[in-house]
Amino acid sequence: HRDLHSFPTRRSSDLGSEETCIGSAEELTAGIEKSIEAGFMTENPYEGFVAGDNSKENYNKIDLHKPYIDKVVLVSPSGKPMYREPDLIDVWFDSGAMPYAQHHYPFENSEKYNPATGKGVFPADFIAEGVDQTRGWFFTLHAIATMIDESVAFKNIISNGLVLDKNGNKMSKRLGNAVDPFSSIEKYGSDPLRWYMITNAQPWDNLKFDIEGVEEVKRKFFGTLYNTYNFFALYANVDEFRYSEAEIPVAQRPELDRWILSLLNSLIREVGDSYESYEPTRAGRAISEFVTENLSNWFVRLSRKRYWGGEYSTDKISAYQTLFTCLLNVAKLMAPIAPFYADLLYTDLNRVAGSEPDQSVHLADFPVFDETLIDKDLEEKMDIAQKVSSMILALRRKEKQKVRQPLAKIMVPVLNPHFREQFEAVKNIILAEVNVKEVEYLTDAAGIIKKKIKPNFKTLGPKYGKLMKEIAGAINQFGQAEIAAFETSGSYTITAGNEPVTLAAEDVEIQTEDIPGWIVATEGQITVALDINVTEELKLEGIAREFINKIQNLRKDNNFEVTDRIVLTIQKHEKTDEAVIRHKDYICAQTLANGLELTDKLNSPNAREAEIDKDVVTLILVERQL
């Protein structure tokens, strides 16, 4: 109640020739006794109050607020009556005294105040309010702290931005663009709503709120994390994984495991630094990318076969331990932003392993990164694998070529020996991911892959002004050798205005031209060419992979367990029979089939149609092996 607090200054009755400021209840009660002796007061309204007794019971005996405090008349050094100053100071000064008033400082808790070292409760670590508090609370906190301690009152400050509608307009009932937060929480949950708001804009920036963004966050981040945990739980239950085995040393784990654990520890460091520097947006975005792009879309997808069937090998245990560690740490990292889902994930994981001593993620210690597990070279190699795979898959989409259709070859120009070494280390991962048989390295691609170069006027103009046209003309004259040299070094020096000018990669745009039978893509310094010719042998293997996909879907439709063995019957078709016969063992192995029979006519009511290729439809019967 700021308006009820009195201004503690007292002035003498002769227009304030004498004044004093009362600094404590003890000083006030002592002044009252003198006033009674001088005849200005007849009784002590704070009778029974014991100076120095800081108990709540003692302070309940007195009331220092208006109007009671106005009945107190004190005595000046010269014997004049002194009355409370009736004027008001800015009421925000009352709020500015909060750091001291909340702990009854300096009369109690002095050990909590050490501005010189910054330890204790003062100065505060963090404060957040609207920008209007620049002249209000923010100012009075600093003003009082400066007067008392010659110190700042807080170390970090955020002025919250506004929540606007998706078009950047202020929300209002009149315009009909206001979003009801309670119905949004009811529909999507508080964690997805909070995650969207934190990751979509920095807290100090205005947020253009779009409910479709909340839907996307719930689907893409929380949905992906939920599916990743479900995948883990499904196979962990099958194999009765409880993390009871001895921990496999990270150095002895497969490269894929070491990579994701390296990324995890890099993530722990980045998220910890982000929270420490009050940048939750950076933390949330890093966690989202790790979960969706690296953990789910890369590690789990490339590791799936390690969890399927087979013996409980060291490789399978490593896969379980690695995924468990990632999920557990993600729960801890996301807890400040998504407290409810993080706690659910944490407790579910702890039921599996029981390795965590705390009942809640909010009681657990924040993760600490292990520098020895961070392998930047391995991260770079896997980044190449991800980029190249993404480029090739994009080329497949461009050609409307299904990933299940194997292709023969990719060609990759080699810029330097180190790049070739890194590419070779992840070659098999790339080939498996994009379903291509082999890679050919080109040490001199100039005669095979043709490139074009164009000046980037957006960067050249601000950098070089009047020289831009001359520089652009020189760039347009580059041949294949100059382009190759530019790509290799990342820069190129020309002469313009009779002066040497060094161009950076951002100053040009390099494009690749397709060659007959191939399609080509370039991203940064990486170029790939994909052979799009499909031989008869590749066609047959593609058909076999289509059968595998359709059979797996039928297993799911029939609610088979992942460990159930099956028997397959396929109706003959002139365009698919050879593929089934040639790749029978492969189809059976991939679908857990103990047998596969081709039949002229499949009459079972449980048989299902399957479109294997355009205008190629046959029947498949999937039965559980009894």
Q: For each predicted feature, which ranges?
A:
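Structured mid-domain segments that build the active-site/substrate or prosthetic-cofactor binding neighborhood
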Residues: T199
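Feature 926 captures the class I aminoacyl-tRNA synthetase adenylation module centered on the KMSKS loop
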Residues: S6, R10-P99, Y105, I148-E186, ...
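Short, exposed "boundary/linker" segments that immediately precede the start
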Residues: H1-H5
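Short, surface-exposed loop/turn microsegments at beta-strand edges and helix-strand junctions
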Residues: P115-V121
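Aromatic-residue-lined binding/catalytic grooves and analogous aromatic/hydrophobic interfacial grooves
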Residues: P106, S110
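A short glycine/serine-rich beta->alpha loop
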Residues: V121-D132
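Short Ser/Thr-interspersed hydrophobic loop/turn segments at strand-loop and sheet-helix junctions
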Residues: T140-M147
